[in-house]
Amino acid sequence: MAVQKSRKTPSRRGMRRSHDALSTTAITVDETTGELHRRHHVTADGYYKGKKVIQDK
């Protein structure tokens, strides 16, 4: 089993964790409906880049 030889300092721990932060998702307003949606994703109404891509049932 792997066991560390000496204790890691808080500085080293912080350096290791420096890339663990979550980034915010990019939100865009749809040009047709004005609805908020994630970038490169279809809106809840079925629009993508101003075109209807999912038909209503």
Curated annotation (Swiss-Prot):
It comes from Hydrogenovibrio crunogenus (strain DSM 25203 / XCL-2). The lineage of its organism: Bacteria, Pseudomonadati, Pseudomonadota, Gammaproteobacteria, Thiotrichales. Residues 21-31 have a biased composition (Polar residues). It holds the Pfam family Ribosomal_L32p. Signal peptide: none annotated. It comes from the Bacteria. The keyword GTP-binding does not apply. GO terms for cellular component: large ribosomal subunit. InterPro entries: Ribosomal_bL32, Ribosomal_bL32_bact, Ribosomal_zn-bd. Residues 1-37 are annotated as: Disordered. Keywords: Ribonucleoprotein, Ribosomal protein. Belongs to the bacterial ribosomal protein bL32 family. GO terms for molecular function: structural constituent of ribosome. This is Large ribosomal subunit protein bL32. Residues 1-16 have a biased composition (Basic residues). GO terms for biological process: translation. PANTHER family: 50S RIBOSOMAL PROTEIN L32, LARGE RIBOSOMAL SUBUNIT PROTEIN BL32.
